[in-house]
């Protein structure tokens, strides 16, 4: 069974007013629970990056931890987490950013990447771009050879708000 990108997107549940009033939340668990959707999403992303020489997939907490390791395995690459403060045990670097409903900080291990790495920075979707921008800044500080940015599902140019 081959699914279109539109079919994958339609399988995502929208939840109004979560986590705060005025935010339309895209719940990707409805896509991930369907084995055919999960496989098709994996296939689409693998085809995009299979010839790029990716050595590390960097996933952003927490939903980047779902497809990130799947994609890393398919690309024969390592997986590196970007996490919220206090979750990584070794020395870290961090970056703070604004998001739709507040301010947050993300961290990565200081020794996670080096100048020989070709990185695929992965998250599930883009809302304001704050998290991805902070993650890009973290990855750039570690000076990898090249960085690709991948979003599994949806690009939202502005925060989606209900009237």
Question: Residue spans of the language-model regions?
Answer:
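Short, glycine/charge-rich flexible loops or terminal/linker lids adjacent to PRPP-binding catalytic cores
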Residues: 77-119
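Single conserved hydrophobic/aromatic residue that forms the stacking wall/gate
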Residues: 149, 154-163
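Short glycine-rich phosphate-binding loop at a beta-alpha junction
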Residues: 54-61
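Short Gly/Thr/Asp-enriched flexible loops that form oxyanion-binding sites at enzyme active sites
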Residues: 66-75, 136
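Conserved G/P- and acidic residue-centered "switch" motifs that form tight phosphate/ATP-binding loops
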Residues: 124, 129
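Conserved acidic residues
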Residues: 55, 117, 147
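Active-site-facing substrate-recognition patch
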Residues: 2-54
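A short alpha/beta connector and helix-capping loop motif
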Residues: 132-153
